[in-house]
Amino acid sequence: MKDGKTVIVPMDHGITKPVAGIENIDDVLRKIDGLADAVVLHKGVVKNSAYVEDMEMGLILHLSASTAYHLNEKVIVSSVEKAIELGADAVSVHVNVGSESEAEQIRDAGIISELCDSFGLPMLAMMYPRGHGIEVNTETVKHAARVGYELGADIIKTCYTGSTESFAEVVEYVSVPVVVAGGEKKSEAELIEDVRNAMLAGAAGVAIGRNVFQHSNPASIVKALKRVIHSSKPRGEMYEGNLVAGGRR
């Protein structure tokens, strides 16, 4: 993490359903390498990539998976040992608090956390309030983040709660860094504004996938995100320049 802040680009979406923008992941990796701090990939992508071994970015191996047919029911599909074998710098797990298989997901994350501690490998926990009748609000996001913290996660990824004030409650409820997820594809202006407000709330950075790899210029949007994340501009100052459209070389 540069100055305690980070830009992570998850690209683990392909196992869920066909997703535009990651047909050729190596192409995206080349475009954002040296800009993003790390990427999140599944083991099959790493094994078959012609680029991962040489990239400058950190590699986070994702251990959880589900398909769109049972989206919230995550299972473990890889291991800490496999992550080490593939040269990963960290692992990630996904827990949906409120899902039908919540108990199993919590158990798995706790066990993996202990293994990570044993091997000296950081664990990113993707923590979400998801399941039948589960609302996404400040309290449920706080709870999900806290579950990850209690299980031993080194960094938490969770959804933005809609305002600086509410997301600050999430950040303050755990004692490990929190990065904000990008969520569904959105406009550049909305993305930048959400990230700016999350950073003002005390976020440690972002973990943004679709809004990067589905962008017409992935390198440019990563540069724009980095500028916001590493900026200390006051909240009222407007976003200056169209960094997204043209980028900076």
Question: Predicted regions: what is each one?
Answer:
Residues R235, R248-R249:
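Basic polycationic patches enriched in arginine
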Residues T6-D54, G58-T67, N72-V180, K186-I208, ...:
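Alpha/beta enzyme core
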